[in-house]
A protein has these predicted regions:
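Metal-dependent polysaccharide deacetylase catalytic core of the NodB/CE4 family, i.e.
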Residues: 33-39, 89-91, 111-234, 268
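Catalytic domains of carbohydrate-active enzymes, especially glycoside hydrolases
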Residues: 52-71, 311-336, 387-396, 439-446, ...
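Aromatic-lined substrate-binding rim segments of carbohydrate-active enzymes
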Residues: 86-88, 101-111, 316, 332-374, ...
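Active-site groove signature of glycoside hydrolases
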Residues: 92-97, 232, 328-333, 375-404
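His/Asp/Glu-enriched short active-site or ligand-binding loop at hydrolase and phosphoryl-transfer sites
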Residues: 126, 187-199, 220-226, 234-278, ...
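Aromatic-lined carbohydrate-recognition surfaces of secreted/lumenal glycan-active proteins
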Residues: 224, 363, 367-380, 408-434, ...
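Substrate-binding cleft of secreted/luminal carbohydrate-active enzymes
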Residues: 254, 258-259, 325, 444, ...
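Active-site clefts of carbohydrate-active enzymes
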Residues: 293-297, 302, 426, 458-480
Length: 521
């Protein structure tokens, strides 16, 4: 311990000299950091979510040196219930999965720094008998690589560790569609025997799982969990409501961002710590020095593919080269002169159950979040929108209305019961009103045709909330490429294509792709 204390004093002195203090957060604000495995310094290659023990110690020292105040879950709850306010630069530390290193490597650091943390446990893994093997997201590893219940109780007795639920057995994929994709169990309707789970069966499955883990944790620690840490960060409003009902008012996601006094407790945001970042990278992330990447979009119309798998394969190849971070996808096709949809519903004719497969492949293989292009006449059909959200995995929607439109907000509320959170790209057909900008939620976009008239409509300071769209069917590639360069020079870094041309657009790709551009401040 003396060696550790000397190490801490030396490192703190260095950090005070080298790193400036971060800017103060607003009253009531706090950030949450999400850690997983903590490996030894001698480990070779690391998993994506692992950090080295030495890097973690340096990060803890930097937090202390920079004036951050790790707080407990109880302090956050007290601050929301009229108790003492959170300190400036408040921060909550969380460790997911319950690997053995949280006891052998993290716990000694917690005692050294006196940092409180939340440790999230998956009951199914801990219920494997000693000497058995745990199916850890498809990889068999020994049960001994996870904490024992004796370890858990020792950490809990310290007063520094609060135990949260990470579900009993939702940390896995389940069959999600006829094509064989597996998707997160907490938000996916299981597909079996050619049918999907109903609302009742889905919610009963979640209730049984969450209740079982609560009972298991209470059995071994004497205290039921007050927080659910959603596996893969995936949940929806129905699942969040269920967790609250079962005694877990706090829910944790993997949405980036600062939690403010207005952030709902069941929807707390967390920064995922990945790939054992350097101390500088860690500091920049915590101090919010990294702005989100600008939106770059393409529009994909599966109805144009003669064969779905062949068309999807070609599209994925192009997306991997381009790497857009918004893929607008049309959910409709026309068959025999009749409009039909690509997902299960009783509200309209169904051409095929393919949209979930298409959206999942685009997200997983190309890394492009999918936004569903909603026809305006769908906004009033809440049953149709609920079916879309039940059966398709997507990140957002494009709505052909102005920001704040009541029909759009009601439609969004319906979908977020089953698919949350949803970003919105508003694409109004009419002229943009002066108050449209203030009606945008954080993270939402206003999509406008790339014209000089629309460029003139954008108020000062709003460039980061508009996405200009070019039509590859009417504008030559060289002209689009020049216009994109002019937009970026004028501070408008968000643009896209209202289509997905097959060939001849190399000049556009190099301007659209973030990979080909330098990092800008």
């Amino acid at each position: 311990m003396a060696i550790l204390n000397n190490f801490r004093r030396a490192l703190l002195a260095l950090l005070f000299a080298l790193l400036p203090l971060a800017a103060a957060q607003a009253a009531g604000d706090f950030i949450v950091l999400c850690y997983h495995e903590v490996e030894s310094e001698k480990s070779g290659s690391l998993t994506r979510t692992a950090v080295r023990a030495g890097d973690l110690a340096a990060q803890f020292a930097w937090l202390q040196a920079s004036g951050y105040h790790p707080v407990s879950l109880q302090q956050i709850l007290d601050s929301r219930q009229g108790g003492p306010a959170l300190p400036d630069k408040a921060l909550l530390l969380t460790f997911d999965d319950g690997k053995k290193d949280v006891f052998t490597r993290v716990f000694p650091l917690l005692k050294l720094f006196r940092f409180p943390v939340v440790v999230a446990l998956t009951g199914h893994w801990l219920n494997v008998p000693d000497g058995g093997m745990v199916d850890y997201d498809g990889v068999p590893i020994p049960r001994s690589e996870f904490v024992s219940w004796a370890d858990v109780r020792e950490m809990q007795r310290s007063g520094l560790v609060e135990i949260a639920s990470h579900s009993y057995d939702l940390h896995r994929g389940v069959l999600a569609n006829p094509q064989g994709n597996t998707q997160p169990a907490a938000t996916t309707r299981v597909y079996a025997d050619s049918v999907y789970e109903t609302d009742e069966v889905y919610l009963a499955r979640l209730r049984t799982d969450l209740r079982r883990n609560n009972e298991l944790i209470k059995q071994h620690t004497g205290v039921p969990p007050r927080a659910i840490v959603w596996p893969y960060g995936r949940s929806n409003r129905a699942a969040q409501d269920l967790a609250v009902e079962l005694g877990m008012p706090v829910g944790m996601t993997l949405e980036d961002g600062v939690n403010t006094a207005n952030t709902a407790l069941p929807q707390l945001k967390r920064y995922l710590i990945e790939e054992s970042p350097s101390l500088q990278s860690f500091a920049e992330a915590v101090r919010h020095l990294w702005s989100p990447d600008p939106a770059r979009s393409v529009r994909i119309v599966p109805a144009q593919w003669p064969l779905v798998e062949e068309g999807l394969s070609r599209t994925l190849d192009e997306l991997q080269k381009l790497s857009p971070n918004v893929a607008f996808v049309d959910p409709r096709v026309t068959r025999n002169g009749q409009k039909a949809v690509l997902f299960p519903t009783t509200r309209l004719p169904v051409a095929a159950d393919e949209l979930n497969h298409i959206a999942w492949q685009i997200e997983r293989r190309a890394g492009s979040p999918v936004f569903i292009d909603l026809p305006v006449d769908w906004l009033g059909d809440h049953g149709l929108l609920a079916d879309l959200a039940r059966h398709v995995n997507f990140a957002g929607v494009r709505i052909p209305r102005a920001p704040g439109d009541e029909h759009a907000l009601r439609a969004l509320n319906v979908m977020e019961r089953w698919r949350w959170p949803l970003r919105v790209a508003y694409a109004p057909k009419e002229a943009v009103a002066a108050d449209a900008w203030r009606r945008l939620r954080p993270g939402d976009l206003l999509v406008l045709p790339a014209t000089a008239a629309n460029l003139a409509l954008v108020p000062a300071g709003e460039a980061g909330r508009v996405l200009f769209e070019f039509d590859p069917g009417t504008q030559p590639p060289a002209e689009i490429a020049r216009a994109m360069r002019r937009l970026e020079a004028d501070g408008f870094r968000q643009f896209g294509l209202a289509g997905f041309p097959d060939a001849g657009f190399d000049p556009v790709w190099s301007n659209l792709s973030l990979r080909s551009q330098p990092l800008l401040p």
